[in-house]
Curated annotation (Swiss-Prot):
Signal peptide: none annotated. One of its GO terms (molecular function) is linoleate 9S-lipoxygenase activity. This is Seed linoleate 9S-lipoxygenase-2. It catalyses: (9Z,12Z)-octadecadienoate + O2 = (9S)-hydroperoxy-(10E,12Z)-octadecadienoate. It comes from Glycine max. Its cofactor is Fe cation. One of its GO terms (biological process) is fatty acid biosynthetic process.
Length: 865
């Protein structure tokens, strides 16, 4: 906070004073994806130029160019003008470059600057910056030294600055002090309000690259009706039929055939949401873009030319993707994609082999994935551990509307279940029955899905909790819509576990149909919808209504890093019509529409981990248990580890919030905070705005819960459902994404094939080779961490706030996370906890806070991939 003593003694009486400063910035071409190749050759380039061929590479040239090209003006926090806004100092230009500064990061340049300042100007609290060059730069920080009676004042900027003529208002940055609106120094109030107004924009026109405007729109850019009916997709958001969270507005022109759909193309995101990275290996998001632009067409050409069959003939064929690789015609592929992409795809220069890293799930055992124990374990310790539910009644019932879908109650009978001596009633009473239930999600779509190449079931899986703490699958129900129509209900068959003969193959296939449901639900709902999509409205609302000076802005923004950018790329390349998800996952063109149906039942408050576990019937409240919850599956790695992380986040949020809100009455008058929450609910999640479960944000407790849910969702929940994708799904036999035929019927050639070879029957049923290559290419990228990742408990700048109490609380949070990581490592070494390793011997590390690379561990602050 500013210390504001009397005027006398602040600065030299009656005279000027030079305030020394250091400006740290990064040149555009250091951060530009297309310039990475030049950087690796040592061609740093200058700051003046058009496009990427910038001029000059020496420090002398750089200093000369900057000489009169970047001007700063200090703004007083204590001395207002007649209009009430703080006085503004003279234009001051950057001086010489600092060749050596210990705190500089890679690619950063530091410059001296000296401001003229006197007593009548008071204490600096903000500054203007004007860039007169034709090329933008990334402004990291300004540090003022030896400010009289203040010492050091820091400005953490982290923002792209374009030519000043492109802005309607001069760019402004505030010191790293923290104020709720009512405590803002009077001289800064006008600047604070003006900056928020600039970030909100006027909701008109097409957004340009340099814009910093945050606004809302519906998902009306996933399809392209101009390319034909097959490329049209329903608009998600803005209707009760297809509700959806809002995404960032781009203002692009509508398509010709549908004025309500937006033309696909390069997607605008507010400029500071796309800040760039330092190493080519960090351009993970752009790897996805390359997949869509180059790799997909290349794979399609290979299979169209019949260079390689679209089927695997044995399980070893699948393992060869990771062991020897498969040969592909580089002479064909190189005509479709650039050479650097070819080299990255083939891993080794000159080697015409596509080879994927060995996924963790087969590194110890090649066949343990096939066991019933592993099949069940991955429901509590795999990549989608947040769906399994406690079974409350038997037989399971459906929530589908019987006036539309008829009778959908399960056909599983009690006498069919092997419950280790328990009756169904006894197992229910002792809370030992659980279910993985995808019946209601898939049944409304199965008829449409099965009219395509794909053939699938809506599945229910019943599991029994054994005395040793592991789960045993005891029945799988495979359901289809009735041939006579939906009103006739479901046609179901119940498959029971078997160890020998054709029945064991049928059981293996039944598990595959379940995993196909699970893979699709995971990618579209657990991952995309419940983390990526639901967070974007909060990012938009935060930037529109919480000033950079606001304590909650400082708390939340690290958890938004890169999310709007990766979501925009997903709309371009992953979830778009005929994109990667539609090509490789079962629901195809219905994929994202299915997530809209699930969003109808999304509840913000249920995203809190304790509330989620209780709602799913896998935990009950127990004041005597850790975190006030008793897990009904005691060895539930995701829940056990997640509750530790959740509690640490909540404690940190409570301690931080208490620094700025002493009483509930402090929350209600905070105009920025109230407007932020009102808009996040009413616009960002507008299709659900009338739901009674939204917190009213009238108390400190509500504020803490809201912020904890946002941070949990963006960090730990996303880590839990994302970074295990390749470790578990990189072996397609373990997590197939599609099924192409139903269970063979007796008397058919397919049935005879199933009798003779369980491997061929399995391979002809699940994901094809083409789909496998696409899927593995994507999830390998999605499962990686960038080398400049910022993990939970870390900040990219140690001076993110000047508040020493906040810094101490944050240090405490970081220390707690280190303790938790050590505790979780000990649990993984506990031989009595079978679900932490399982038959595949893959320890549960997805909620270990730190990591890098393709490691199946690490919690980034944000949804950055």
């Amino acid at each position: 906070m500013f210390s504001v003593p009397g005027v006398s003694g602040i600065l030299n009486r009656g005279g000027g004073h030079k305030i020394k400063g250091t400006v740290v910035l990064m040149r555009k071409n250091v951060l530009d994806f297309n310039s990475v190749a030049d950087l690796t050759k040592g061609n740093v380039g200058g700051l003046i130029g058009t496009g990427l061929n910038v001029v000059g590479s020496t420090l002398d040239n750089l200093t000369a160019f900057l000489g009169r090209s970047v001007a700063l003006q200090l703004i007083s926090a204590t001395k207002p003008l007649a209009n009430g806004k703080g006085k503004v100092g003279k234009d001051t230009f950057l001086e010489g470059i600092i060749v050596s500064l210990p705190t500089l990061g890679a690619g950063e340049s530091a410059f001296n600057i000296q401001f003229e300042w006197d007593e009548s100007m008071g204490i600096p609290g903000a500054f203007y910056i004007k860039n007169y060059m034709q090329v933008e730069f990334y402004l990291k920080s300004l540090t003022l030294e030896d400010v009289p009676n203040q010492g050091t004042i820091r400005f953490v900027c982290n923002s792209w600055v374009y030519n000043t003529k492109l802005y309607k208002s001069v760019r402004i940055f505030f010191a790293n002090h923290t104020y709720v609106p009512s405590e803002t120094p009077a001289a800064l109030v006008g600047y604070r309000e003006e900056e928020l107004k600039n970030l909100r924009g006027d909701g008109k026109g097409e957004r340009k690259e340099h814009d910093r405007i945050y606004d809302y729109d519906v998902y009306n850019d996933l399809g392209n009706p101009d390319h034909g009916e097959n490329f049209a997709r329903p608009i998600l958001g803005g209707s009760s039929t297809h509700p959806y969270p809002r995404r960032g507005r781009t203002g692009r022109y509508p398509t010709r055939k549908d004025q309500n759909s937006e033309k696909p193309g390069e997607v605008y995101v507010p400029r500071d949401e796309n800040f760039g990275h330092l190493k080519s290996s960090d351009f993970l998001a752009y790897g996805i873009k390359s997949l869509s632009q180059y790799v997909l067409p290349a794979f399609e050409s290979v299979f169209d030319l019949n260079f390689t069959p679209n089927e695997f003939d044995s399980f070893q064929d699948v393992r060869d993707l990771h062991e020897g690789g498969i040969k592909l015609p580089t002479e064909v592929i190189s005509t479709i994609m650039p050479l650097p992409v070819v080299k990255e795809l083939f891993r080794t220069d000159g080697e015409q082999v596509l080879k994927f890293p060995p996924p963790h799930v087969i590194q110890v055992s090649k066949s343990a994935w096939m066991t019933d124990e592993e099949f069940a374990r991955e429901m509590v310790a795999g990549v989608n551990p947040c769906v399994i539910r406690g079974l409350q009644e038997f037989p399971p019932k459906s929530n589908l509307d019987p006036t539309i879908y008829g009778e959908q109650t399960s056909k599983i009978t009690a006498d069919a279940l092997d419950l280790d001596g328990y009756t169904v009633d006894e197992a229910l009473a002792s809370r030992r029955l659980f279910m993985l239930d995808y019946h209601d999600v898939f049944m409304p779509y199965i008829r449409r899905i099965n009219q395509t190449y794909a053939k699938a079931y809506a599945t229910r899986t019943i599991l029994f909790l054994r005395e040793n703490g592991t789960l045993k699958p005891v029945a799988i129900e495979l359901s289809l819509p009735h041939p006579a129509g939906d009103l006739s209900g479901a046609v179901s068959q119940v498959i029971l576990p078997a160890k020998e003969g054709v029945e064991s193959t049928i059981w293996l296939l039944a598990k595959a149909y379940v995993v196909v449901n699970d893979s699709c639900y995971h990618q579209l709902m657990s991952h995309w919808l419940n983390t990526h999509a639901v967070i974007e409205p909060f990012i938009i609302a935060t930037n529109r209504h919480l000033s950079a000076l606001h304590p909650i802005y400082k708390l939340l923004t690290p958890h938004y890093r890169d999310t709007m950018n990766i979501n925009a790329l997903a709309r371009q390349s992953l979830i778009n019509a005929d994109g990667i998800i539609e090509k490789s996952f079962l629901p195809s063109k219905h994929s994202v529409e299915m997530s809209s149906a699930v969003y109808k039942n999304w509840v913000f408050t249920d995203q809190a981990l304790p509330a989620d576990l209780i709602k799913r019937g896998v935990a009950i409240k127990d004041p005597s248990a850790p975190h006030g919850l008793r897990l009904l599956i005691e060895d539930y790695p995701y829940a056990v580890d997640g509750l530790e992380i959740w509690a640490a986040i909540k404690t940190w949020v409570q301690e931080y919030v208490s620094l700025y809100y002493a009483r509930d009455d402090d929350v209600k008058p905070d105009s920025e905070l109230q407007q932020w929450w009102k808009e996040a609910v009413e616009k960002g999640h507008g299709d659900l705005k009338d739901k009674p479960w939204w917190p009213k944000l009238q108390t400190i407790e509500e504020l803490v819960e809201i912020c904890t849910i946002i941070i949990w969702t963006a960090s730990a929940l996303h880590a839990a459902v994302n970074f295990g994708q390749y470790p578990y799904g990189g072996f397609i036999l373990n997590r197939p994404t599609s099924s192409r035929r139903l269970l063979p019927e007796k008397g058919t050639p397919e049935y005879e094939e199933m009798v003779k070879s369980h491997q061929k029957a399995y391979l002809r049923t699940i994901t094809s080779k083409f789909q496998t290559l696409v899927d593995l290419s994507v999830i390998e990228i999605l499962s990686r961490h960038a080398s400049d990742e910022v993990y939970l408990g870390q900040r990219d700048n140690p001076h993110w706030t000047s508040d020493s109490k906040a810094l101490q609380a944050f240090q405490k949070f970081g220390n707690k996370l280190k303790e938790i990581e050590e505790k979780l490592a000990r649990k993984n070494n506990d031989q009595s906890l079978s679900n932490r390793l399982g038959p595949v011997q893959l320890p549960y590390t997805l909620l270990h806070p730190n990591s890098e690379g393709l490691t199946c561990r690490g919690i980034p602050n944000s949804i950055s991939i």
